[in-house]
């Protein structure tokens, strides 16, 4: 069967649909045939074959595991074939192609999630044995596999699986920690001695994989990590290592120097900034960093100490600086945002699904702002009110920087609307300033018109009096005019929706505006193209 599988896999990689479609159909028919996955294993483990054929084989194997490896899966793989494959998959860790090595590691991890340790108790001991060995490439592949296996096992949340993972952690943590320490030390010594980058790469890659393994073990493998001697030793060492690495980083003056200059500021560590801000958010929101009740009633001394440390760090001065920095630096629309507005305003208006705070800097900073504002409202309310007073007056339409600052402040005020209920006289602000800003029609001022629509929508359910709602409806109808910028019109729609969804909404108040609103919405519906917008 191997020769036939190789031929069909080769056809499945063709650019000719007349060749591709029949090959895909044949592979689909073979998915449930006995011996198919053994044949796929034979193909991708044969280093003499073309990489693209081996790549197709491992992908089909991986997809087959998702569909047919479970015991109760329809047309599932037979147990004797699964046992054979489990043995063969961990018999050789010398895959020379990095991309295939990664796919193999993910494949083994998928099987481990179903079978380890009950049906595959030799997996972890085999990986540890290879890691202890002297074969450099096999050691790297085993570490890569161990990382993905630990990641897969850590994701299982049933109580029995959690206990099994805690047992696994107890058995391997000392070895993994010592091995990580060894490779990290080796990397730092090589780096300080000016060793060639190609030689440094090997210990660095292995140290990084071990660090990823340690992260999963420590986070998910201990009920109380602070009681583990290994965990506490790791935390002590990691801060020392971080300091050393940051000092050594200063010597990197060639390829990465540009990133640390003003010209390269846009390239500098955005992913790192996101990680740092998310760490701060996690500390602010963690139940382990604040007592359940009063500080004097908490029985856990670690919780009390963590709370005290948090309060000592977040002083009035520190909070003021953080809040001001978040709003006036990280909330600003960027040139890329403005370019997107010009080219694809619908995409700018649609909120990302999923969890954008994990990868998007603005989404991340907004959540950090909310977390810190909720926790320290008594301090930060006055800071934000001061920013409002500083930026609430109309600005010159030609002064783009002032417009962007005003937009950022209004964004913060909208996000913190509920926390500012007693601090802001929104009716007065609406009547004297906000409605007037909607009348400024310069191109740059579309930024403010859009933000004002959004801001009023956020406050409509918080503190917009009933007597002002008719005027609000009229302003939003004007903002929906076909002559208005599309970004502003989409913000006006959202504002209207929030007001209509509010429990204080009265049908009779809105009836005079219903026909014109519906007509404008229908006109806009014909203009937009994105399904999310529609």
Regions found by a protein language model. Give the residues of each.
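Karyopherin-beta/Importin-beta family HEAT-repeat alpha-solenoid scaffold
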Residues: 1-534
């Amino acid at each position: 069967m191997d020769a036939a599988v190789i031929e069909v896999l080769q056809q499945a990689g063709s650019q000719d649909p007349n060749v591709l479609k029949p090959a895909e159909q044949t592979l689909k028919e073979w998915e449930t045939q006995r011996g198919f996955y053994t044949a796929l294993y034979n193909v991708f483990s044969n280093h003499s074959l073309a990489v693209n054929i081996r790549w197709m084989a491992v992908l089909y194997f991986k997809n087959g595991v998702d569909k047919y490896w479970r015991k109760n899966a329809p047309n599932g793989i037979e147990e004797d074939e699964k046992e054979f494959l489990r043995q063969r998959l961990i018999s050789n860790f010398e895959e020379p192609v990095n991309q295939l090595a990664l796919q193999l590691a993910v494949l083994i991890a998928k099987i481990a999630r179903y079978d380890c340790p009950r049906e595959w108790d030799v997996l972890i001991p085999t990986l540890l044995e290879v890691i202890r060995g002297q074969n450099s490439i096999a050691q790297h592949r085993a570490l890569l596999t161990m990382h993905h296996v630990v990641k897969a096992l850590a994701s299982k949340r049933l109580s029995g699986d959690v206990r099994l993972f805690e047992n696994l952690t107890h058995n391997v943590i000392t070895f993994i920690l010592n091995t990580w320490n060894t490779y990290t030390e080796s990397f730092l010594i090589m780096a300080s001695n000016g060793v060639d980058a190609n030689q440094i790469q090997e210990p660095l890659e292995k140290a990084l994989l071990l660090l990823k393994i340690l992260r999963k073990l420590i986070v998910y493998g201990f009920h109380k990590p602070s009681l583990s001697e290994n965990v506490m030793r790791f935390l002590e060492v990691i801060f020392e290592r971080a300091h050393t690495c940051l000092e050594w980083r200063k010597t990197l003056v060639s390829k990465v120097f540009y990133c640390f200059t003003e010209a390269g500021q846009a390239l500098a560590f955005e992913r790192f900034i996101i990680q740092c801000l998310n760490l701060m958010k996690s500390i602010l929101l963690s139940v382990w960093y604040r007592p359940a009740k009063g500080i004097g009633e908490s029985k856990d001394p670690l919780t009390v100490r963590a709370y005290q440390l948090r309060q000592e760090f977040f002083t009035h001065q520190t909070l003021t600086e953080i809040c001001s920095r978040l709003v006036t630096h990280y909330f600003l629309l960027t040139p890329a945002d403005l370019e997107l507005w010009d080219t694809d305003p619908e995409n700018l208006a649609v909120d990302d699904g999923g969890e954008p705070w994990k990868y998007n800097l603005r989404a991340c900073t907004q959540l950090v702002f909310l977390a810190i504002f909720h926790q320290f409202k008594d301090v930060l309310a006055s800071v934000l009110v001061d920013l409002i007073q500083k930026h609430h007056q109309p600005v010159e339409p030609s002064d783009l920087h002032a417009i962007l600052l005003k937009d950022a402040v209004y964004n913060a005020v909208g996000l913190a609307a509920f926390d500012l209920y007693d601090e802001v006289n929104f009716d007065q602000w609406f009547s004297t300033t906000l409605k007037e800003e909607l009348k400024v029609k310069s191109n740059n001022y579309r930024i403010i018109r859009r933000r004002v629509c959004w801001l009023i929508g956020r406050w409509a359910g918080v503190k917009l009096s009933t007597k002002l709602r008719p005027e609000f409806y009229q302003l939003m109808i004007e903002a929906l005019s076909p002559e208005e910028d599309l970004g502003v019109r989409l913000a006006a729609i959202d504002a209207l929706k929030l007001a209509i969804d509010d429990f204080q909404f009265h049908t009779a108040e809105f009836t005079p505006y219903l026909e014109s609103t519906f007509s404008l919405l229908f006109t806009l519906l014909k203009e937009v193209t994105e399904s999310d917008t529609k």
